[in-house]
Amino acid sequence: MMAYMNPGPHYSVNALALSGPSVDLMHQAVPYPSAPRKQRRERTTFTRSQLEELEALFAKTQYPDVYAREEVALKINLPESRVQVWFKNRRAKCRQQRQQQKQQQQPPGGQAKARPAKRKAGTSPRPSTDVCPDPLGISDSYSPPLPGPSGSPTTAVATVSIWSPASESPLPEAQRAGLVASGPSLTSAPYAMTYAPASAFCSSPSAYGSPSSYFSGLDPYLSPMVPQLGGPALSPLSGPSVGPSLAQSPTSLSGQSYGAYSPVDSLEFKDPTGTWKFTYNPMDPLDYKDQSAWKFQIL
C-alpha cells in the first residue's frame, strides 16, 4: 500500500520538471525561470610600474599592434585584453584634452560664430520673369535699313540677281523696263511654242516681248482663266512685280493683265486636223540634229 502513496517519478516537459499528477507549474501565473544575472567585471587597478610601461608604449604609438600589447601584458602581468581596453580609454582621454585646449585658446566670443544676415524675399530687387527677354536684342539694338529709291541700282540687283547668272552684270533701268511683257505680243502666236536658250531668258530683255519668248507657250493655258476669275487675268510678269519692288498687295496686282481676252486664246483648236509644230532653235543647249523629232501629229 505504501508504494502507491509515494509520488511517481519526475517528468520533464519543455525542460520543466513536473512532479506526478501536479500540474501547477503549467499555470499561467507561474513564470518561467529567468537567466542568472551576469556579474559585473571588477575594475582593474594599475600600479605605478604598470602605468609607466603603458605610458611609455603610448608615447611611441597610440595604436599598438597585438604583438606589442602581448609583450607589455607579459611585463606588467596583466591579460592582453586589459591592455587593449586601457589604450582605448587613453585615446579617448587624449582627444578630450585636445578639445579642452582648443576651447581655452579661443576667445569668449569666438564660440558663437556670427551668422550672415538672411536676406528677406521682398527687399532684394530681383529681375521680373513675367516678360520673356528678347534673345536677339531686336527691340533695343536692331534698326531696319532704310528703303532705297525705287530706281536705285541696288534694288535692281536684289531683284534680278536671283534669276540671272553670276557672270552677267546687273540690268540697267532701261533693260528692266523691257522685262514687262506686252499683251499683244504674248497673244499673237498662241499655238507656236519656241524653246529659246537659257541665257536669253536671263539677259535678253527682248525675249519677253517677242513671239518667240519663253513664256509665249504658256499663254494658251493662262488666258482661259479670265472668265472664271470674273475680271482681268493676273500676270506674273506684269508691271512692277518684276520691277523695283516685289512687295505689292494682291489688290494692286488684280488690275494688271496680259491684255484683252480673245477667243483665239482658248485651248480649242480651230482646225482639228492641224498639227502643233515646235520651232527648233539652233541655240538650244539640247543638241538634236534631227528636226523631225520636234513634229508630232495630233490624233
UniProtKB/Swiss-Prot annotation:
Q: Is-annotated flag, keyword Glycoprotein?
A: no
Report where it is expressed, by tissue: Retina.
Annotation: DNA-binding region: 39-98
Keyword list (alphabetical) reads: Activator, Cone-rod dystrophy, Developmental protein, Differentiation, Disease variant, DNA-binding, Homeobox, Leber congenital amaurosis, Neurogenesis, Nucleus, Retinitis pigmentosa, Sensory transduction, Transcription, Transcription regulation, Vision
Name a Pfam family for this protein. Homeodomain
Q: What is the effect of changing E42K?
A: In LCA7; uncertain significance
- Region described as Disordered: spans on this chain: 93-155
Highest rank taxon of the organism: Eukaryota
Does this UniProt record's set of keywords contain Transferase? no
Q: What subcellular locations does the record give?
A: Nucleus
Q: What is the effect of changing R90W?
A: In LCA7; reduced DNA-binding ability, transcriptional synergy and interaction with NRL
Q: Which GO terms describe its biological process?
A: animal organ morphogenesis; cell differentiation; nervous system development; positive regulation of transcription by RNA polymerase II; regulation of DNA-templated transcription; regulation of transcription by RNA polymerase II; retina development in camera-type eye; visual perception
Impact upon substituting R41W? In CORD2; exhibits reduced DNA binding, transcriptional synergy and interaction with NRL
The biased composition feature labelled Low complexity covers 97-114
- Effect of mutating R115Q: In RP; uncertain significance
In the UniProt annotation, what is the result of changing K88N?
In LCA7; reduces NRL transactivation and reduces steady state levels of CRX and NRL; altered localization to the cytoplasm
Q: Name one GO cellular component term.
A: RNA polymerase II transcription regulator complex
One MF term in GO for this entry? DNA-binding transcription activator activity
Q: State which disorder the record connects to this protein.
A: Leber congenital amaurosis 7: A severe dystrophy of the retina, typically becoming evident in the first years of life. Visual function is usually poor and often accompanied by nystagmus, sluggish or near-absent pupillary responses, photophobia, high hyperopia and keratoconus.
The family line of this record is: Belongs to the paired homeobox family.
Provide the function of this protein.
Answer: Transcription factor that binds and transactivates the sequence 5'-TAATC[CA]-3' which is found upstream of several photoreceptor-specific genes, including the opsin genes. Acts synergistically with other transcription factors, such as NRL, RORB and RAX, to regulate photoreceptor cell-specific gene transcription. Essential for the maintenance of mammalian photoreceptors.
Please give the subunit comment from the record: Interacts (via the homeobox) with NRL (via the leucine-zipper domain). Interacts with PDC, RAX2, RORB and SCA7.
The name this protein carries in UniProt is: Cone-rod homeobox protein
